[in-house]
Every structure is written in C-alpha cells, then in structure tokens.
C-alpha cells in the first residue's frame, strides 16, 4: 500500500524513481480505507533529506499511511527554506487537538548541549507529554531517543571520548519480540553521535526493556513494556552516502573526526560505501507500523 504525501513535496519524485509506492492526497481520499495517521517531528537540519529517508521506510509497509510533518515553533532552522516549511509543515498548536496513530521524533545536532539549553526543549517536553494521550506509539531516533529517555524516565546522556561513528553489528537481546520479528541474530545499523546512554541506567527502570545491543555502539533499541515508546539510538533511515557526507563535512570544517568504522570498503574513503543495513531498517519500520501502531490503534479515536 502507498504512503500519502503532499502533492508537491520534493521527496515524491525521488521516491517514485526508487519504485516506492506514493500517492498524493487527492488520490488517497478516493480510496475507502482507514489509513494510519503518522506525525513526524523533524528536528534534523537538512529537513528534505530526512523527509525522503523516513518516507522511504514508511512507504514499504503494506499499510496506507498519511504523514503530517511537524516542526518546533520556537526554532527557526537555517538550512531549510521558509517556503518549504510553510508549505509542508505545521506547528504544535495547530495539531494538539488531534489524535495520531504513530509519531516519529528525529535526531538533532544538539546532543552536546544540556537538554534544558536547547532552545525548543520546553516545546519538545510539551509534545512528549501530549504523546501519552494522543499517540498510540512513538518512535524516537538518536538524539530524539536520548531526549525521550531523559524526559520520560530521567535517564541521562553521557559524553563519549570520541564520536560513535560508523556502521556496527548489533545483537538481538530479547527473542520473540514483535518489533524484531524476522531479524537475524546479528544485524547492522549506522550510528553518528557524540553522546551515549548507559545500559545500567536503563536496567534500573522496570518499564523499559533493552531489545538490542552493540559491543561497540552500546544500547541500540529500547522499548517501554506497553510498546507506546520506542527508543532507537542509531540511524537506520540513513542513505548509503549519509555518513560519507557527514565525514567530508567535518573534515572541511577542520573538526576532529575519524573514518566511519566498518563503512567504506577497506576503510578507503575513495571507494563508494555499500548500504548493508537497508533490509533490517525496512523490517524494523514495517514491524513497528504493523504490531505497535496498526494492531493497537483504535479504528476511531474517541
């Protein structure tokens, strides 16, 4: 089934070229199907890239999905045009009365700041509190996961001695959990972050279960016992070239950065990187949409 997106969204052409089934709202409204309503709080600086990456994964589900893009009203991004934001995004006061079947809170390049110093932290906490009553299941990604663990459970983040940067092996810690249904015992996922959460802090919280770990990247996937809050410290949505672009960006800025681990063939940045995480990324999103959103959400919200 398709993903429903605004008619002129730039991601539409890219997704169609990749044979991802998309349709605009006009065609979707003509189908007598109850679609899932997913809201994406996009905190990434390059919003159009993040849109395409997330829509690509949502579009591989057999379910019909309506997507709403949300941005903080208290933050003015520097790398996305005002026209794009006005055309395709809404702000929290305009949707706080609505119910959504699922929500995605993306990462953001603010992880080295204390949470309370992020200029939209107050608004973000208001949104995360709202999800308790208005969203069936929320998927938090990278810094979004750290922010959610801190807000909901008081779990802090810790600075790393060097950036966790590369594509790492992960193991399934809990068998027969629906979110990881169909996963291999070992799977790969990109990470790109300067901070971490600790296993021992999470294990102190009875409502949380660690579903996946990495020897090198640490905690990867955490879920609340009711499945309403999912925390993912990696970036399964990343394109094959995203880490390459981040590496070249940091080199150009003169920042201390090492070659992304287990990413370039033979650790040679002149070689094109291979996407070795795509199948599990798609499976993760399909499982979340099916078992944690579609199977749990009411047909009609009260």
UniProtKB/Swiss-Prot annotation:
Cysteine disulfide partners in this protein: none
Protein name: Homoserine O-acetyltransferase
GO cellular component: cytoplasm
Keywords: Acyltransferase, Amino-acid biosynthesis, Cytoplasm, Methionine biosynthesis, Transferase
Residues under site feature: Important for substrate specificity: 192
A Pfam family the protein falls into: HTS
Task of the protein: Transfers an acetyl group from acetyl-CoA to L-homoserine, forming acetyl-L-homoserine.
Gene Ontology terms: biological process: L-methionine biosynthetic process from homoserine via O-succinyl-L-homoserine and cystathionine
Enzyme Commission numbers on file: 2.3.1.31
Site entry (Important for acyl-CoA specificity), positions: 111
Record has Transferase as a keyword: yes
PANTHER family in the record: HOMOSERINE O-SUCCINYLTRANSFERASE (PTHR20919:SF0)
Compartment annotation: Cytoplasm
Binding, substrate: 163, 192, 249
GO molecular function, one term: homoserine O-acetyltransferase activity
Associated pathway: Amino-acid biosynthesis; L-methionine biosynthesis via de novo pathway; O-acetyl-L-homoserine from L-homoserine: step 1/1
Protein family: Belongs to the MetA family.
Active-site positions on this chain: 142 (acyl-thioester intermediate), 235 (proton acceptor), 237
Reactions catalysed according to its record: L-homoserine + acetyl-CoA = O-acetyl-L-homoserine + CoA
């Amino acid at each position: 089934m398709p993903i429903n997106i605004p008619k002129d969204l730039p991601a539409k052409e890219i997704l169609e070229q990749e044979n991802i089934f998309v349709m605009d709202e006009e065609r979707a409204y003509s189908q007598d199907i109850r679609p899932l309503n997913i809201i994406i709080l996009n905190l990434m600086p390059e919003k159009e890239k993040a849109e395409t990456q997330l829509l690509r994964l949502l579009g591989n589900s057999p379910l019909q999905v309506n997507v709403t893009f949300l941005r903080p009203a208290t933050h003015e991004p520097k790398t996305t045009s005002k026209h794009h934001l006005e055309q395709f995004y809404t702000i929290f006061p305009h949707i706080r009365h609505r119910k959504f079947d699922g929500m995605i809170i993306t990462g953001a390049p603010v992880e080295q700041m204390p949470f309370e110093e992020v200029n939209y932290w107050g608004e973000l906490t208001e949104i995360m509190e709202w999800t308790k009553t208005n969203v069936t299941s929320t998927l938090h990604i990278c810094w979004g996961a750290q922010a959610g663990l801190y807000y909901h459970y008081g779990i802090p983040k810790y600075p790393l001695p060097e950036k966790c940067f590369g594509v790492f092996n992960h193991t399934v810690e809990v068998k027969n959990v629906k979110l990881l249904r169909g996963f291999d015992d070992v799977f790969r996922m990109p990470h790109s972050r300067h901070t971490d959460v600790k296993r021992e802090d999470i294990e102190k919280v009875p409502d949380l279960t660690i579903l996946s770990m990495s020897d090198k990247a640490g905690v990867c996937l955490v879920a609340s016992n009711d499945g309403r809050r999912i925390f993912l410290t990696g970036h399964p949505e990343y394109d094959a070239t995203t880490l390459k672009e981040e590496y070249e960006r940091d080199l150009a800025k003169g920042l201390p950065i090492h070659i992304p681990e287990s990413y370039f063939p033979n650790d040679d940045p002149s070689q094109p990187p291979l996407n070795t995480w795509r199948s599990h990324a798609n499976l993760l999103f399909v499982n979340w949409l099916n078992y944690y959103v579609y199977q749990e959400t009411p047909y009609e919200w009260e």
